[in-house]
Regions:
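Catalytic Walker B motif of ABC-type/P-loop ATPase nucleotide-binding domains
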Residues: 158-162
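A short, proline-enriched helix->beta-strand linker immediately N-terminal to the Walker B motif
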Residues: 152-156
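Conserved ABC ATPase "signature" region
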Residues: 100, 104, 111-129
Length: 249
């Protein structure tokens, strides 16, 4: 059974000229890092929002771990972690207080929660800043706390929307390296959106390049690159397939 199965998924927002998603279908194997890649407005975030139950599809179907998103969302939410692009933290609370709050939401308490928080703060180099208010954090520090909040409950599937956008090179590398090791150590499936194709090329086992709500191509990054003549990167592949840069809006 695949981790995610999507069939003919469509989404058209009210008053929109074009659909945000135009009949996309794919299957994502378990224990893989899968990237949805493309420019802003391509349909990446809409896809993840439907999988999380934040947005309802216009038509089509989606399953996570064999459960129908439209019918079994309550059960699905117990086994997924969501890390949104917009920082979902309380700025007046400290990093530790934020993590305690999110841990409590998942039913974690006492020493179990304390040990998890201590472990991840150390992993992400945040121990010395744990008792500072989030409003005092840099963008990279906020991203790291945001990620920790999404994995405290040991999800079977982790969904990340642009997890490294707007951060410094050091934080970007730290997050990418962690996702690789976390995937290997736990066999967790990771879904990830990005318009940073160089990063995705190194991180993802498989990618789907999306443009104007459609999947342009899908497969292992190096396989896709090798199949295209005079192509040496995902960025070059995107330009060849769409006629524009991923940075174009």
């Amino acid at each position: 059974m695949p981790a995610v199965s999507i069939h003919s998924l469509c989404k058209t927002y009210k008053d929109a000229v074009e659909p945000s998603l135009n009949s996309i279908s794919l299957e994502i194997p378990r224990a893989t890092i899968f990237g949805f890649l493309g420019p802003n407005g391509a349909g990446k975030t809409t896809t993840l929002s439907i999988l999380c139950g934040l947005v309802k599809a216009t038509s089509g179907s989606a399953k996570i771990l064999g459960k129908d998103v439209s019918k079994e969302l309550k059960e699905i939410k117990k086994c997924i972690g969501m890390v949104p692009q917009d920082i979902a933290l309380f700025p007046t609370l400290t990093g530790q207080e934020n993590l305690t709050y999110f841990g409590n939401l998942y039913g974690l308490k006492g020493k179990v929660l304390e040990n998890k928080i201590e472990h991840y703060l150390d992993t992400f180099g945040l121990t010395n800043n744990a008792h500072k208010r989030v409003s005092q954090y840099s963008g990279g520090m906020k991203r790291r706390i945001n990620l920790i909040a999404g994995i405290l409950h040991d999800p079977q599937l982790l969904i990340l929307d642009e997890p490294t956008v707007g951060v410094d090179v050091q934080s970007r590398k730290m997050i990418s390296d962690f996702l690789k090791s976390y995937n290997k150590a736990n066999g967790i499936t990771i879904l990830y959106t990005s318009h940073m194709l160089d990063e995705a090329e190194k991180l993802c086992d498989e990618v789907a390049i999306i443009d104007h709500g459609k999947i342009v191509t899908q497969g292992a990054p190096q396989t896709l690159i090798a199949q295209q003549e005079n192509c040496h990167s995902l960025e070059a592949l995107f330009i060849q397939l769409t006629g524009r840069s991923v940075r174009d809006h």
